[in-house]
């Protein structure tokens, strides 16, 4: 099955407040240093019928605002790796935020009970 998805916007979300200077370099633990690299692509799906009273633009704005505030507390996630030093430069570079839309229903009534 082919899924048609329209990308509405792509942007970088940065922490809502800058990382303090004394926390700019985050040293990785020994376990983090020996673990193989991996990536968790995350896609969140929302049933638009549950958000009838909230416009899509407003919903996206709230998600971006929440993400920016979260990155303030989890500042290494918004940084870049320094491979030769086994650390993260907590430079507030930010994370990717992609907003998209699809006319397809992702979870049908048959599969919905499995996800609840």
Show which residues each predicted segment covers.
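Non-catalytic N-terminal regions of enzymes
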Residues: 1-116
């Amino acid at each position: 099955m082919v899924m048609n998805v329209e990308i509405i916007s792509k942007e970088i979300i940065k922490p809502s407040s800058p990382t303090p200077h004394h926390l700019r370099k985050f040293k990785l633990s020994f376990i983090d240093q020996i673990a193989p690299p991996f990536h968790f692509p995350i896609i969140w799906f929302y049933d638009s019928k549950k958000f009838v009273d909230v416009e899509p633009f407003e919903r996206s704005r709230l998600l971006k605002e929440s993400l920016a505030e979260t990155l303030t507390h989890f500042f290494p996630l918004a940084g870049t790796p320094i491979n030769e030093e086994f650390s993260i430069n907590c430079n507030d570079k930010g994370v990717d935020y992609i907003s998209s839309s699809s006319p397809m229903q992702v979870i049908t009534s048959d599969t919905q009970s499995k996800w609840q």
